[in-house]
Amino acid sequence: MFTKLMTAIFGSSNDRTLRRLNKRVAQINRLEAEFEKLTDEQLQAKTAEFKQRLAEGATLDSLLHEAFATVREASKRVLGMRHFDVQLIGGMVLTERNIAEMRTGEGKTLTATLPCYLNALTGKGVHVVTVNDYLARRDAETNRPLFEFLGMTVAVNIPGLPSDVKRQAYLADITYATNSELGFDYLRDNLAHSKEERFQRPLHYALVDEVDSILIDEARTPLIISGPAEDATQIYQAIDKVIPHLIAQDKEDTEEYTGDGDFTLDLKSKQAHLTERGQVKVENILTKMGLMHEGESLYHPARISLLHHVYAALRAHKLFEVNVDYIVKDGEIVIIDEHTGRTMAGRRWSDGLHQAIEAKEGVNIQGENQTVASITYQNYFRLYEKLAGMTGTADTEAFEFQQIYGLDTVVIPTNRPMIRDDKTDLMFKSEPEKFQAVIKDIQDCIARKQPVLVGTISIEKSEALSEALKQAGIPHKVLNAKFHAQEAEIVADAGYPGAVTIATNMAGRGTDIVLGGNWKAEIAKLENPTQEQIDEIKAKWQERHDIVMQAGGLHIIGTERHESRRIDNQLRGRSGRQGDPGSSRFYLSLDDALMRIYLNEGKLNMMRKAFTEEGEAMESKLLTKVIASAQAKVEAYNFDGRKQLLQYDDVANEQRKAIYEQRNYLLETDDISAMINTVREDVFNAVIDQYIPPQSIEEMWDVPALENRLKQEFGMELPIVKWLEAEDDLHEETLRERIINIAKEQYQAKEAMVGAEVMRSFEKGVMLQNLDELWKEHLSAMDYLRKGIHLRGYAQKDPKQEYKKESFAMFTDMLDHLKSNVISVLSRIQVRSQEEVEQAERERQAHAEQESSHYHAEGEGQDFSDLHIGRNEPCPCGSGKKYKHCHGSKAKYS
């Protein structure tokens, strides 16, 4: 009550921010007349002037008004578009490291030019982050003429680019890239064997488009680069045969309740658990198969991997459905993104789940991979010096953006009032009844020539609805993961009078649905259109546009509520752009997943009884509250999951940063001999301490064991026993000093044989190779620790604190191993000539390159030839030429 009163008097935080920024908009507007008088050359010279002023100590904020006025004027001349005042506000919000919520159709692409230009003046590079290759290419080509007019270089970074092209892309002032490619390039840079192989500069400013999709929906997806591990194909096939013998149980066993099933399912977290009865049954089956010995337990340390396979197979069979979570395409399992409905070619589930699904579907089982490098989007984007984002739907997740990324959300007002009619939800008893009502609504729209976009939550649902529409004789197009290649074309046609388009979730997001159809797309299909053809296309479009406007604009039908209100708002947001008319309605049933999973059986039964007739629809405020309550539960559950992930990943992140800093130092430094000398002393002191404890008497020493250790580990044959017999005054300190000095002298003798330069290169190579190998093993160990740490909760211990403590101990142990391994290799290496060392170094590099050639990045793309690029589309390499005149011509003749 008090908060509402204060807001009524002083306005909300958002209102106060907008009032402050409106004053700055007025200052930019006052410059417009002055900048209109400038010649093109004078306007272009502003870039050099701003850079000079920055070099002399000016701040970006002090240049903002003039820089924005420059971009606005250049846009009018080059693109024929003038930034609205609300777009100037959006640009300032993005400059101030915030998230701008701008409704669909309000011109986010043009708004982005303002902060991009301003931040690019520093010369440190700007990354504009998009969710897919198509949007990266499209936005870069849209804004390229404007940026190049102002003297800025523009490039595109997408999967499949040659290394030299990718390196050039990162050197551009403004680089458009996909979120996954940026993350993978960061990981690849930290697997590079020389500084010349790296791609990225220090991360300066990132502007994330569709920020909610990248920083929230994909936050729990780690970016992983992996290499091949041992083959376990036969085990996956054997375990797959076990699952049909197991029976599901409704709930977990407790002291009061013991079920008669073998496993339970947690639908929220998509996890499966064996009951005690199920464990015994599985052990008996595996023993008969010869995979276990009589009397052995699945929880025996030697059999834990089998338990891991059983759980993966259970999840594959009982929790992951074909055409919902994945599709089978060309004999491979292709994941479907649950948030966008798009396929994610190249991505694989971890923890053996992908192989278990391959076994279930009877396709070729590809080998498991070992993690070589990984990072989450949460931690990658927090590496940027400045981070900002924009989307049409962020306000519902404002708390999470602030908590995790420190980003405030500012809702930008629309340029024209929003007049879309959002109708109340209709609830039906069953799915068939709901589909009948949807078909009736679609038929009404077609009769008045109103285009309809129907949103579904999965491929399975979209195909079921498509089948129902076919039976009703309604022509329509389906936009889902199976038809990804035609996505832009289907979206372009979705605004035609009476057009019916079914879309999974937010497939096609980022592309506006233009009422009457996309006339620009029609013109783009023509090779060299004449002015007469262009005028004819525009005239026909205007006729169609008027028909659609009169019919009520684009009508949105949601066939199911999503887990998140934000995704529902995104679907609605496709209609009513820039003051256009539009309408939306959600059709629900008690069979919907949201209802079944998040409402208890009592509530569902009560709601079923409320329906008295078949086909009856329920419409009430109470219903809206029930749905909102279910969605709030899911959002809270998902937020908690992302927060938990971050808390655990933050531990690994500190270690990752330390290792990558050390690695970068090694790549940048030619001479690490001082480091090697320090490490040598540390290692020898640690070894000697084990056999000759500090400040101890001679009777406590184990000299023969020390002699043996020095020989085995460092190739040093030292007669320490004889020294002690011959020299009475040889005490602990002098003995320690002598051993370390001899080690140094032997090493210096080797260096004299091959030369200092070769030895420095060899030291660096050995250090890098050991660091990479041990870090890879450490990542696997951390994965295992993370998976089992929750069990500490049963011992009344805080799992997070235990994870921190144990992972730190593991990290310290890894560093000790690194030091010991490096000194051992450098001490034992036998060199007779410079040529031998150079040959050893060449072999080491060849081995490293061979290993890296097997690395696989989840979500990595393909070569240009597989990207389905139109001949007249811009080339994805970022050259600015048409594809047919650039890499397209090379592809044609290669």
Swiss-Prot record:
Coiled coil: none annotated. Its main location: membrane. May bind 1 zinc ion per subunit. Its cofactor is Zn(2+). Gene3D superfamilies: Helical scaffold and wing domains of SecA, P-loop containing nucleotide triphosphate hydrolases, SecA, preprotein cross-linking domain. One of its GO terms (biological process) is intracellular protein transmembrane transport. Keywords: ATP-binding, Cell inner membrane, Cell membrane, Cytoplasm, Membrane, Metal-binding, Nucleotide-binding, Protein transport, Translocase, Translocation, Transport, Zinc. Its EC number is 7.4.2.8. Zn(2+) binds at C875, C877, C886, H887. One of its GO terms (molecular function) is protein-exporting ATPase activity. Part of the Sec protein translocase complex. Interacts with the SecYEG preprotein conducting channel. Has a central role in coupling the hydrolysis of ATP to the transfer of proteins into and across the cell membrane, serving both as a receptor for the preprotein-SecB complex and as an ATP-driven molecular motor driving the stepwise translocation of polypeptide chains across the membrane. Belongs to the SecA family. NCBIfam families: PRK12904.1, secA. This is Protein translocase subunit SecA. It comes from Glaesserella parasuis serovar 5 (strain SH0165) (Haemophilus parasuis). The gene is secA.
